[in-house]
Amino acid sequence: MRRFICSLLAGFMMLPLMAIPLHKGCLPARDNWYGSPESMIVAENVLLLQRNNGGWAKNYRKYRKEMSPEERKQLKEIRAQISESTIDNKATYSELVFLAHQYQANPDKRYVKAFKRGIEFMLSLQYDNGGFKQFSRDKGYYTHITYNDNAMVNVLTLFWHILQHDPLFEPFVNEAMYKKIQASFDKGIDCILKTQYVQNGVKTVWCAQHDEFTLAPAKARAYELPSLSGSESVGIVHLLMSLPNPSADIQEAVHAAMAWFDANRITDHRITYIIDEEGLRDRRWVESTKGNDLWGRFCELDTNRPFCADRDGIVKYDISEIGYERRNGYGWYTDAPLQLFPIYETWKQDLR
C-alpha cells in the first residue's frame, strides 16, 4: 500500500493542508538541484518517455540515467504504447511538476509543449460525471473511477494549484486551458460528493474505485473488493478540507466521513512481525493497544468490519488466513486517518 503522503518541495508554494506528491524518479536530489547537469539528464528522459497521448507510464526507475543513442532509439519506439499512460502511482503529474520546476531553472520551450500535452491527457481521462479513470484503456477495472493510491485526488490537487495561479505553473497555462481545468475540477469535486457511500441513510466514506456508470463501489483486482476504504478516503477528505469557502454539501461530506473514521478505529489490535520457521519476516494481527490506532483499508459495506482477501477473492478477517505473499505484499491496515483529526478541528473552527 502506498500511504497518502505529502512530498514537500523546497521553495514550492503549497495549498493549505495539501501538497502535490511526486514519485521518486522526479524528486529533487538536493536543494538547488533544478538546472543542474543531473536534472538536465532527467528532463531529457522525461521528454523522451512521454507517450504519444501525452501521458507517462508508471514506475519508471531510470530517469537519472544518461541514455546511449541505442537506448534512446529503443525508448522512442515505446511512445506509441499509449495504453501504459496513467495517473496511477503518481505518474504523469510527477513529470509535469518536475518540468515546471525545471523550466524555472532552464526555460526550454519543449517543457511547455510537454506540459500542455500532459494536462490534455489528464483531461481525457475524465468522464462526464467528473470521475477519472487511471489509464487510457477501455476494458477491465482500469475504467473505474479511481481513488486508489490517490490517483484522482492527486490530479485534482495539481489542478487546484494551477487554478490558484501558482507562479510555478503560470508559464504553461493560458486562459482557455484555465477554463478547461476549472470545469474539470468542479466536476471532479461533484463526483467525489456523489460517490460518498450512503449506508442505511448515513453518509460514510469512499471505496478505492467506483463504477463509472452507477458510481457504486467497484471491484478491482481479485483481492480489492467493493468496500469502504480507511486508506483512500483519507486523501479525499484532506482535499475537501483544503478548499476555501466549502459549500454546505462539502461540509456535510467532511463531517460524515470524519464521524465514520472516529467510529471505526481499531483500538485493540495491531500489526506485528515475527520470523517464521523458514527465517522469513512475517506479519501477524495480534491483540494489543500499543501504538497508533488503525483502520482497515477494506471495510464491509454493510457492517464496516475490516477484511482482507487473497488472490482467490475470498473474504477473510485475519491476515493469518491469507497466503504469505498477499499477507506481506499488501497494506491491509493504516494509521493514515490520524493525520486528519487535528486538521479537522482547525477546519471546524475556521467555519465559525
Region spans (language model):
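Positively charged n-region of N-terminal signal peptides that target proteins for export
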Residues: 1-4
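Bacterial N-terminal signal peptides
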Residues: 7-16
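Terminal, non-catalytic domain-edge segments
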Residues: 20-42, 161-187, 213-220, 224, ...
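Solvent-exposed loop and edge beta-strand segments that line ligand/cofactor-binding
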Residues: 26-35, 77-91, 140-152, 219-232
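N-terminal carbohydrate-binding/catalytic regions of secreted carbohydrate-active enzymes
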Residues: 36, 40-93, 98
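Long, well-ordered core segments of solenoidal/helical folds
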Residues: 42-54, 114-131, 181-201, 253-270
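Intrinsic, low-complexity N-terminal interaction/targeting segments
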Residues: 56, 61-63, 69-79, 128-139, ...
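Eukaryote-skewed repeat-based solenoidal scaffolds used as protein-protein interaction platforms
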Residues: 112, 116-119, 123, 139-196, ...
